[in-house]
């Protein structure tokens, strides 16, 4: 079974990007990550600094028992999104996402794609302090309850270059050219979509939008996908997967809606201006161009026959207005991660437990 669950979004700076993915791996495969220098201080490394494969396996067992209750509660919170009382108890204000360096400065051929760093806040995976290690890419592990040699790992990117490239292409299609009709539940969510081919695999996709005042149009577009090279495996589980995707999306939408007003009231936005041009505010209109400092008085473009001037001479003498408000925003990098949008610092822990649970019962879903 080569199934990957992933969450992506359309980044204003990088385009369609992968934020989070969960995959089923064997322990022998996971131990290879510690061959890379950037992976030695992982969440699976033992407290005494011993990073051998045997010590790593023992530490995984110990930490899995300690974190099982928190992961289980996170799974229930995503699959019970219609309970507003539960949200009021579980959703807490998370810290603003820290800035991260671009992966172009730290990536090398010897590193796995899992060690890449996102270049913006909106594409980053932010974990609670108890699940994170400083200077190490966020990763989560869950042991399989049926097979001791299998575990489920979540990270921002898959662990192999081939799987990363394939997942990247599928995410680009989900957020650019593959569209479905709008869902009856909400205008900001489409119906589940199934597509794929033999080369890149097959996908069940659920695209949706979340309220984010810092995004263009006040909405940020996301997509949850389940990809598998076997078309029949996804078709047999289409109803179950699409139902669980709907529950996750409902939870995320309720969380972002409840925190939208709090964010709008705490952050005051002003009209950005620079010497190179004028940038528009939401109340900006075309008539205000005449009062702009870099335009002066609005010129007249009417041609009078009594003057005797031709169009070519006026084109050189008259100064056209600078429609610089149509230019790209300078604050494009000032986005918010999914943690800030939902105001829940454990949102990626909940996604990990939800995707891991689906992978755990994958073989039991065939009717």
UniProtKB/Swiss-Prot annotation:
InterPro entries: FLCN/SMCR8_DENN (IPR037521), Folliculin (IPR021713), Folliculin/SMCR8_longin (IPR037520). Residues 131-302 form the uDENN FLCN/SMCR8-type domain. One of its GO terms (molecular function) is GTPase activator activity. Keywords: Cytoplasm, Nucleus. It is found in: Nucleus; Cytoplasm. Residues 65-75, 99-115 have a biased composition (Polar residues). GO terms for cellular component: cytosol; FNIP-folliculin RagC/D GAP; nucleus; vacuolar membrane. GO terms for biological process: Golgi to plasma membrane protein transport; negative regulation of TORC1 signaling; positive regulation of TORC1 signaling. Residues 54-64 have a biased composition (Basic and acidic residues). The keyword Nucleus applies. The keyword Cytoplasm applies. Its main location: nucleus. Pfam families: Folliculin. Residues 41-75, 92-115 are annotated as: Disordered. It comes from the Eukaryota. Belongs to the folliculin family. This is Folliculin-like protein bhd1. It comes from Schizosaccharomyces pombe (strain 972 / ATCC 24843). The lineage of its organism: Eukaryota, Fungi, Dikarya, Ascomycota, Taphrinomycotina. The gene is bhd1.
């Amino acid at each position: 079974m080569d199934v990957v669950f992933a969450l992506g979004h359309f980044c204003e700076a990088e385009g369609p990007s992968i934020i989070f993915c969960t995959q089923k791996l064997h322990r022998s495969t996971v131990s290879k990550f510690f061959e890379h220098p950037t992976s030695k201080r992982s969440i699976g490394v033992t407290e005494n600094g011993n990073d051998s494969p045997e010590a790593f396996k023992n530490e995984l067992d110990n930490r899995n028992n300690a974190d099982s209750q928190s992961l289980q509660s996170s799974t229930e919170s995503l699959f019970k999104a219609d309970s507003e009382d539960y949200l009021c108890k579980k959703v807490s204000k998370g810290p603003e996402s820290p800035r991260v360096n671009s992966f172009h400065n730290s990536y090398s051929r010897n590193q796995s794609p899992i060690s890449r760093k996102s270049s913006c806040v909106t594409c980053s995976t932010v974990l609670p302090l108890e699940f994170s290690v400083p200077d190490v890419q966020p990763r989560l592990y869950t042991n399989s309850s049926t097979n001791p040699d299998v575990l489920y790992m979540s990270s921002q990117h898959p662990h192999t270059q081939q799987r990363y490239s394939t997942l990247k292409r599928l995410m680009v299609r989900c957020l650019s050219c593959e569209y479905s009709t709008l869902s009856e539940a909400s205008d900001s969510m489409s119906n589940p979509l199934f597509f794929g081919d033999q080369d890149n695999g097959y996908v069940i996709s659920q695209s949706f939008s979340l309220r984010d005042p810092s995004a263009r149009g006040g909405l940020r577009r996301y997509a949850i996908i389940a990809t598998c090279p076997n078309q029949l495996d996804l078709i047999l589980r289409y109803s179950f997967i699409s139902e669980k995707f709907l529950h996750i999306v409902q939870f995320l939408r309720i969380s972002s809606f409840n925190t939208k007003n709090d964010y709008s009231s705490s952050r005051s936005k002003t009209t950005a201006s620079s010497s190179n041009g004028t940038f528009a505010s939401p109340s900006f209109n075309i008539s205000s161009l005449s009062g702009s400092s870099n335009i002066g008085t609005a010129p007249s473009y009417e041609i009078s026959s009594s003057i005797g001037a031709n169009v070519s001479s006026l084109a050189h003498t008259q100064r056209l207005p600078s429609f610089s408000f149509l230019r790209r925003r300078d604050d494009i990098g000032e986005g918010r991660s999914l943690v800030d949008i939902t105001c829940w610092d454990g949102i990626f822990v909940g996604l990990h437990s939800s995707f891991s649970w689906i992978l755990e019962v994958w073989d039991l879903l065939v009717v």
